[in-house]
Amino acid sequence: MNKSILFSLLLVITSNSFAEIVEVYRWKPFPGKSAQLLSDMQKAAQIHNEMGISVQINQLGIGSTQNIDYVMRFDDMEAWCELKDMNAVSDDWSSFYSQVAANPGGELVESINGINTDTSVMADDFENEKVFSVFVWDPAPGRSQDLAQGFETAARIHEALGARVESYAEGFGGTDKMHYVMIYDSWSDMADVQNRMSTSEEWLAFQNANSAATEPAATLVQTFTGQTVANFD
């Protein structure tokens, strides 16, 4: 990791110590074991939820390889540290982990930690999350703040059109990319929002301004959709 990325990571962590923290563990089911993996995740979520950790299980869709995300949410850095320590000494978790390790339903392919850019958001604010789309942006050197400001403008437009928006800066497991997450009540709601976006003069003007920039603040590197199949809050 080069020095500029390391500095950005440390800056994000220290400046957002009172913001919601999310941990995402991305799993690829073994052939014929998707149901087992989901069952194991639900058992894990029950253990974690009893500790006070909010958990979502998300099935990824278009733009992904159909993996399953196990998502843990914490109110802030203090809660993250406290609950991680609790998990480390949990007999229930240790016993469950040993059982799953002996007969896994899938393999962990990625894990990442993210920090919400909105300090007012709490871990239990995602109880009604159903369908989402994610846009991962890689900021140009020195342009992270410009990207964050662009996110704020886009979020204001999108929320006026009916979507909920959250944005995250990558922490441990990532570099300095940022994730723009749009949340909807259903797939039909997603379609309705997209239709409104296609005729929104404000959104089209914002897009055109970004497209015309000779030195864009960031590059879009990944997009995908998904839906929450289980929520433990």
Model-assigned labels for residue ranges:
Residues 14-16:
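N-terminal signal peptide c-region/cleavage motif recognized by signal peptidases
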Residues 18-233:
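Short S/T/G/P-rich N-terminal loop/turn motif that feeds into the first structured element of a domain
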Residues 6-9:
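Sec-dependent N-terminal signal peptides
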Residues 1-4:
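Positively charged n-region of N-terminal signal peptides that target proteins for export
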